[in-house]
Amino acid sequence: MAEGEDVPPLPTSSGDGWEKDLEEALEAGGCDLETLRNIIQGRPLPADLRAKVWKIALNVAGKGDSLASWDGILDLPEQNTIHKDCLQFIDQLSVPEEKAAELLLDIESVITFYCKSRNIKYSTSLSWIHLLKPLVHLQLPRSDLYNCFYAIMNKYIPRDCSQKGRPFHLFRLLIQYHEPELCSYLDTKKITPDSYALNWLGSLFACYCSTEVTQAIWDGYLQQADPFFIYFLMLIILVNAKEVILTQESDSKEEVIKFLENTPSSLNIEDIEDLFSLAQYYCSKTPASFRKDNHHLFGSTLLGIKDDDADLSQALCLAISVSEILQANQLQGEGVRFFVVDCRPAEQYNAGHLSTAFHLDSDLMLQNPSEFAQSVKSLLEAQKQSIESGSIAGGEHLCFMGSGREEEDMYMNMVLAHFLQKNKEYVSIASGGFMALQQHLADINVDGPENGYGHWIASTSGSRSSINSVDGESPNGSSDRGMKSLVNKMTVALKTKSVNVREKVISFIENTSTPVDRMSFNLPWPDRSCTERHVSSSDRVGKPYRGVKPVFSIGDEEEYDTDEIDSSSMSDDDRKEVVNIQTWINKPDVKHHFPCKEVKESGHMFPSHLLVTATHMYCLREIVSRKGLAYIQSRQALNSVVKITSKKKHPELITFKYGNSSASGIEILAIERYLIPNAGDATKAIKQQIMKVLDALES
């Protein structure tokens, strides 16, 4: 069930008894938001109580004066712009002359101090003046005005709320999920959400709506205490304009943008109840992953978006976590339920699949279009029947599952695009594919007695393919140590708690047609006519060097490894360190420099540089917006490299595994992948430098 579904719709009762209860609760003091919510129940607030309620909702009631320690000097480089914007705002308010000067100073001080304390450069496009408008009408003292403004900026204005910003790519995915036809139309006209909704989000509608309407919207929004709810309010406003937009196809791009941008201005007080009710409905029909996977858009900058987070502008559709897929279909009654479509090749599906998944071989789309069309027809019929019968496999929401490997999932992406082109609503993709599902089941110890997921995996036999212990040992035996693996021809090895057992898994897996490395779309499509390479333990050509620890080896990459560990073993300070690329390349201790692309587990790539010194290897990731500069993305000691591997199909894709060794075996601590031109020369040079380090340690 999507988060926020429990919040009741706006009631229609107009009795004033609740207003008296509210006033008494506020007068008594110590009132929290939950208490207020129970009294107000979403109704528009009385004007004389609004300030107190908002301060409690924003958690600033009783907070001290943040500006007390400030010298009050208005001396920012952009101060003239701030003053001009504030003056223009005061003129619009029709404030008595004797109060205008004081209010002007308050507003200018709030903006100036916020810029100074947060180290932000002010510009008119930021919508801050509009954001202050509803607060100014509350006639708050300067300290409260600042505290409320700060709280709204921190909790309700998303990070990167700018042209081409991440919040707007996310909004497009939400539009596509619920209104694919409208999304397709806007895409065709190259109208992106930031072109019309920048100030919707940046001012929480205050830029376009009257003060009265804005305050009514904020009354409900602040009581929800859910920053993501603004997305659903925006969606309803957009959906409300859908019919007009689609019937005026002759309008130019600029005309459509102007029309959309001003749509909120037509809202009146009577519309607010329906606006919230409809937004709540769409919210309840949205997967929880929409919020959970993007929670870092809001809140403290300490939880900011990492550079390696998925680029939402490149996302084909909304991604759903495998944990949500499993949990959703165990729910009873209303809520988001998924009809899972497994798009892997037949041999992989037969080896093991989610027991409730419908199989749709994505290869058929190119190899046998007529059979593919029939399969799609069967899929939709099966979905309909499963919903009608109340089956656990039933769900309105189509979720496509691939292998989790970008090279193979390209074909699934074509299938996804097919459904999106048909304007099919509620289309999503399982994040990480079947590989992520297996990993999740291993992580939660799927055979444990206290969970209900044990029946989720099926195989060709039709019976449950349990996650059995390796080497045929009893699940309860002492040698098992709780480490499980799918061994009935499963296509990837699961993460285990012991390297020794992990090594055993390798020799048990015969079919390795589900490699784990997910590549970006820039790489050439795999040749589907070629025979898949089967891997056995004999393929492990790398051997320890003279027993030196840690063990280091070079060889072809095992295409079933799933013990992925994020390579970010650095501190936050390291991650933020910015350096000049050329200065570092020219350092006397840098022995080798290799331009490359860092490849994250998600498949996304970042232009980078590998620098090798006598003892360390550094990865400098280029900062796109600051030419010539880079982040120190990784700093690894050469003696911690335990394995370097490459792919048969993509020899330029090099994987470095870092760790240490003990009597029980090798412990992998970090994994990094790079796409390196002339990879052979690079790995040779790095290997030679590693050998020098190991020789020095040995001697």
UniProtKB/Swiss-Prot annotation:
Cross-referenced SMART domains: TBC (SM00164)
Record-listed Phosphoserine modification sites: 300, 469, 474, 507, 520, 571
Biased composition (Polar residues): 459-479
Domain Rhodanese: 334-446
Role summary: Putative Rab GTPase-activating protein which plays a role in vesicular trafficking. Involved in endosome-to-Golgi trafficking. Acts as a bridging protein by binding simultaneously to golgins, including GOLGA1 and GOLGA4, located at the trans-Golgi, and to the WASH complex, located on endosome-derived vesicles. Together with WDR11 complex facilitates the golgin-mediated capture of vesicles generated using AP-1. Plays a role in brain development, including in cortical neuron positioning.
Location relative to the cell: Golgi apparatus, trans-Golgi network; Cytoplasmic vesicle
Region (May mediate the interaction with C17orf75, FAM91A1 and WDR11): 514-573
Residues that bear Phosphothreonine: 514
One of the GO biological process terms: vesicle-mediated transport
Name of the protein described by the UniProt record: TBC1 domain family member 23
Gene3D superfamilies recorded: Rhodanese-like domain (3.40.250.10), Ypt/Rab-GAP domain of gyp1p, domain 3 (1.10.472.80)
Record key words, sorted: Cytoplasmic vesicle, Developmental protein, Disease variant, Golgi apparatus, Phosphoprotein
Pfam families, sorted: RabGAP-TBC, Rhodanese, TBC1D23_C
Domain (Rab-GAP TBC) ranges: 44-225
SUPFAM superfamilies the record matches: Rhodanese/Cell cycle control phosphatase, Ypt/Rab-GAP domain of gyp1p
May mediate the interaction with FKBP15 and WASHC2, as annotated region: 574-699
CDD domains with a match to the protein in the record: TBC1D23_C-like
Gene Ontology cellular component list: cytoplasmic vesicle; cytosol; Golgi apparatus; trans-Golgi network
May mediate the interaction with WASHC1: region residues: 514-699
Disease named in the record: Pontocerebellar hypoplasia 11: A non-degenerative form of pontocerebellar hypoplasia, a disorder characterized by structural defects of the pons and cerebellum, evident upon brain imaging. PCH11 features include severely delayed psychomotor development with intellectual disability and poor speech, microcephaly, dysmorphic features, and pontocerebellar hypoplasia. PCH11 inheritance is autosomal recessive.
Annotated gene: TBC1D23
Top-level lineage group: Eukaryota
Main location: Golgi
Oligomeric form and interacting partners: Directly interacts with GOLGA1 and GOLGA4. Interacts with FAM91A1, C17ORF75 and WDR11; the interaction recruits TBC1D23 to AP-1-derived vesicles. Directly interacts with WASHC1 and WASHC2A/FAM21A. Interacts with FKBP15.
Species annotation: Homo sapiens
